[in-house]
Swiss-Prot record:
Ligand binding (ATP): 235-242
Region annotated Disordered, chain positions: 20-44, 58-81
Function noted in UniProt: Mitochondrial membrane ATP synthase (F(1)F(0) ATP synthase or Complex V) produces ATP from ADP in the presence of a proton gradient across the membrane which is generated by electron transport complexes of the respiratory chain. F-type ATPases consist of two structural domains, F(1) - containing the extramembraneous catalytic core, and F(0) - containing the membrane proton channel, linked together by a central stalk and a peripheral stalk. During catalysis, ATP synthesis in the catalytic domain of F(1) is coupled via a rotary mechanism of the central stalk subunits to proton translocation.
CDD domains from the UniProt entry: ATP-synt_F1_beta_C, ATP-synt_F1_beta_N, F1-ATPase_beta_CD
GO biological process, one term: proton motive force-driven mitochondrial ATP synthesis
Name of this protein: ATP synthase subunit beta, mitochondrial
Keyword set, alphabetical order: ATP synthesis, ATP-binding, CF(1), Hydrogen ion transport, Ion transport, Membrane, Mitochondrion, Mitochondrion inner membrane, Nucleotide-binding, Transit peptide, Translocase, Transport
Pfam families listed in its UniProt record: ATP-synt_ab, ATP-synt_ab_N, ATP-synt_VA_C, Synthase_beta
Subunit-structure text: F-type ATPases have 2 components, CF(1) - the catalytic core - and CF(0) - the membrane proton channel. CF(1) has five subunits: alpha(3), beta(3), gamma(1), delta(1), epsilon(1). CF(0) has three main subunits: a, b and c.
GO CC, one annotated term: mitochondrial inner membrane
Reactions catalysed, as given in the entry: ATP + H2O + 4 H(+)(in) = ADP + phosphate + 5 H(+)(out)
GO molecular function: ATP binding; ATP hydrolysis activity; proton-transporting ATP synthase activity, rotational mechanism
C-alpha cells in the first residue's frame, strides 16, 4: 500500500515538472510579434480593405499594380504589409521536384502569392498553393529547382505573379513570369497586372452575333467562328492542329485591325521558334525601330518547362490580352496552343500537392481550373477577346474528361479527323462532327445556311451508303445514290485547301477564299453544275474558277 502511494506521488511530481517545462517551452516559442498583434485591437475594416486591394478585378486599370521586386536588391526582412506579409523572409525547408516547402516565422503569405528565392543563380519564383500549418507553406516552382538547398532565403512579394502588359509586349516573347526570352533586352513599361484576376461581371459583358471570316472554306461554310467567341480545334497527335492555328493567325491577324496574343502552352519549342520566324517574315512582328508597329505578343511555356510554368502560362497570355481589351478597347485575338497541356500541367501539380486523382487520373479540380481560365475569355462593352484554342484529344477519344470538359465552354468546335487526314485531305476537318452556334439562318442568312445544310446532307448520305458500297460495290446502287456519291466525293475534295504556312512543305501557293465565293461554289456543286468535272480537279484548290482551270489542264494532259 505504501509503495503504491509513493509511486503515485512520484508520478504527480513528474507530471507537474513536465507541465511546467511544456508551458515554459510554449511561452518561449511564441513570437513577440504575435503576442503584440494579439494584444493590439485591429482597426475597424482594416482586413476587409486589405482583402479588397489584394483581389483585383478584371476591369481594374492597368497602372495600379506595382513592379514586382527584383531579387538583386537586398531585402531587409521588414514586413511592409500586415495583410499579405509583404517583405517577410522565409526559409526553404523541403524540395521535392517542382514542390518547395517554405517556413515563415512571421508574415505568412496568402494563397497564390508569389515568392522569390534569394541568392539564386536565376530568378526563381514560387507560387503559394497550400498552407500546411506551423507557419509552413507549400509552393509550386515556376522554373527548375536545380541547385536549391534547404535553408535558402525566400522573399514574400505580397502580390500574385505580376507581368508586364501593354504595347511594350508587342513583337516580344515573354515567359510565365513576364521576363523577355527573345534576347532583345528587358521589356520597358509602367503597366503591370497580376495573372490571377476575376472574370468580368455580368453587367460588363456583351454578346454580338457577328461572323469572323477566316478564308478557310470548310470553317467559314460549315462551322463559322463568332467574333468575340471561343473556338476549339480538336484533334489527336499529328492531324494538323498547329498548322491550322498558324494559318488562322496568318489569315485573320493580317486582315484584323486589333492585336493578337499567342500563348504556347506545353507545346514543341521548335514550333514556337518557327511561328516567331514566320511572323517576322510576314510582317506581323517587326523588329528594331518599327517594333511598335507589331501586331502580336508571344507568351511561351513550352514542353521542357516545369508543370508550374505550364499551368500558369495560359493565364499570363490571357492577362496580356485582357489589358488590350479593357484598357485600350481593342478586339483581341487570343491563340492558345495547346489548352490540353494546361489541364495536363494542372494534373501534375495536383498530384505533386498530394490530392487524390479523379476520373482517368485527372485532378479533382479539373472543371474549376478550366472554368477559371475560360470565363475570363469574354466580350465586354469595352472590347472583345476572340479565342482560338488547339485541344489535343488523347487517343482520339472525345469522351476523355479533358476535352469533354472543354466542350461546354466553346461557341464553335472544329474537329480534325484522322480518317480524313489518311485520305490526304487537308485541313482534315470533319464536316459532320464540327459544330457552331453561328450556323443559323437568322445570323448567316438563308443562302449560307441552306448551302451548309445541303453539303452536310450529301456527306451524311454518302457516309450511310459506304457500308453498302463496301459489301456490294457501286454497281448495286440506284442512279440517285450514284449521283449522291459522286457529288459527295467532289465536295469532300473541294473542302481541301492549300495553306500559306504549308507552302514550304507542299510547294503549292496558299489560298484565301472569300465567304461569298465559297457559298456560290458549293451551291453550284449541289445543283449539279460541275457534275462533268473530275474529282481530281476539286482537290487542293481555292475557288470554283481554279477547279475549272485545273480540269481543263488535266483534260489537255490526258489528251496529249
Amino acid at each position: 500500500m505504501a509503495s503504491r502511494r509513493l509511486l503515485a506521488s512520484l508520478l504527480r511530481q513528474s507530471a507537474q515538472r513536465g507541465g511546467g517545462l511544456i508551458s515554459r517551452s510554449l511561452g518561449n516559442s511564441i513570437p513577440k510579434s504575435a503576442s503584440r498583434a494579439s494584444s493590439r485591437a485591429s482597426p475597424k475594416g482594416f482586413l476587409l480593405n486589405r482583402a479588397v486591394q489584394y483581389a483585383t478585378s478584371a476591369a481594374a486599370p492597368a497602372s495600379q499594380p506595382s513592379t514586382p521586386p527584383k531579387s538583386g536588391s537586398e531585402p531587409s526582412g521588414k514586413i511592409t504589409d500586415e495583410f499579405t506579409g509583404a517583405g517577410s523572409i522565409g526559409k526553404v525547408c523541403q524540395v521535392i521536384g517542382a514542390v518547395v516547402d517554405v517556413r515563415f516565422d512571421e508574415g505568412l503569405p496568402p494563397i497564390l502569392t508569389a515568392l522569390e528565392v534569394l541568392d539564386n543563380q536565376i530568378r526563381l519564383v514560387l507560387e503559394v498553393a497550400q498552407h500546411l500549418g506551423e507557419n509552413m507553406v507549400r509552393t509550386i516552382a515556376m522554373d527548375g529547382t536545380e541547385g536549391l538547398v534547404r535553408g535558402q532565403r525566400v522573399l514574400n512579394t505580397g502580390s500574385p505573379i505580376t507581368v508586364p502588359v501593354g504595347r511594350a509586349t508587342l513583337g516580344r516573347i515573354i515567359n510565365v513570369i513576364g521576363e523577355a526570352i527573345d534576347e532583345r533586352g528587358p521589356i520597358t513599361t509602367d503597366h503591370f497586372l497580376p495573372i490571377h484576376r476575376e472574370a468580368p461581371a455580368f453587367v460588363e459583358q456583351a454578346t454580338e452575333q457577328q461572323i469572323l471570316v477566316t478564308g478557310i472554306k470548310v470553317v467559314d461554310l460549315l462551322a463559322p467562328y463568332q467574333r468575340g467567341g471561343k473556338i476549339g480545334l480538336f484533334g489527336g497527335a499529328g492531324v494538323g492542329k498547329t498548322v491550322l492555328i498558324m494559318e488562322l493567325i496568318n489569315n485573320v491577324a493580317k486582315a484584323h485591325g486589333g492585336f493578337s496574343v499567342f500563348a504556347g502552352v506545353g507545346e514543341r519549342t521548335r514550333e514556337g521558334n518557327d511561328l516567331y520566324r514566320e511572323m517576322i517574315e510576314s510582317g506581323v512582328i517587326k523588329l528594331g525601330e518599327k517594333q511598335s508597329e507589331s501586331k502580336c505578343a508571344l507568351v511561351y511555356g513550352q514542353m521542357n518547362e516545369p508543370p508550374g510554368a505550364r499551368a500558369r502560362v495560359g493565364l499570363t497570355g490571357l492577362t496580356v490580352a485582357e489589358h488590350f481589351r479593357d484598357a485600350e478597347g481593342q478586339d483581341v485575338l487570343l491563340f492558345i496552343d495547346n489548352i490540353f497541356r494546361f489541364t495536363q500541367a494542372n494534373s501534375e501539380v495536383s498530384a505533386l500537392l498530394g490530392r487524390i486523382p479523379s476520373a482517368v487520373g485527372y485532378q479533382p479540380t479539373l472543371a474549376t481550373d478550366l472554368g477559371g481560365l475560360q470565363e475570363r475569355i469574354t466580350t465586354t462593352k469595352k472590347g472583345s477577346i476572340t479565342s482560338v484554342q488547339a485541344i489535343y484529344v488523347p487517343a482520339d477519344d472525345l469522351t476523355d474528361p479533358a476535352p469533354a470538359t472543354t466542350f461546354a465552354h466553346l461557341d464553335a468546335t472544329t474537329v480534325l479527323s484522322r480518317q480524313i487526314s489518311e485520305l490526304g485531305i487537308y485541313p482534315a476537318v470533319d464536316p459532320l462532327d464540327s459544330t457552331s452556334r453561328m450556323l443559323s439562318p437568322h445570323i448567316l442568312g438563308e443562302d449560307h445556311y441552306n448551302t451548309a445544310r445541303g453539303v452536310q446532307k450529301v456527306l451524311q448520305n454518302y457516309k450511310n451508303l459506304q457500308d453498302i458500297i463496301a459489301i456490294l460495290g457501286m454497281d448495286e446502287l440506284s442512279e440517285d445514290d450514284k449521283m449522291t456519291v459522286a457529288r459527295a466525293r467532289k465536295i469532300q475534295r473541294f473542302l481541301s485547301q492549300p495553306f500559306h504556312v504549308a507552302e514550304v512543305f507542299t510547294g503549292a501557293p496558299g489560298k484565301y477564299v472569300d465567304l461569298k465565293e465559297s457559298i456560290n461554289s458549293f451551291q453550284g456543286v449541289l445543283d449539279g453544275k460541275y457534275d462533268d468535272l473530275s474529282e481530281q480537279s476539286f482537290y487542293m484548290v481555292g475557288g470554283i474558277d481554279e477547279v475549272i482551270a485545273k480540269a481543263e489542264k488535266i483534260a489537255k494532259e490526258s489528251a496529249a
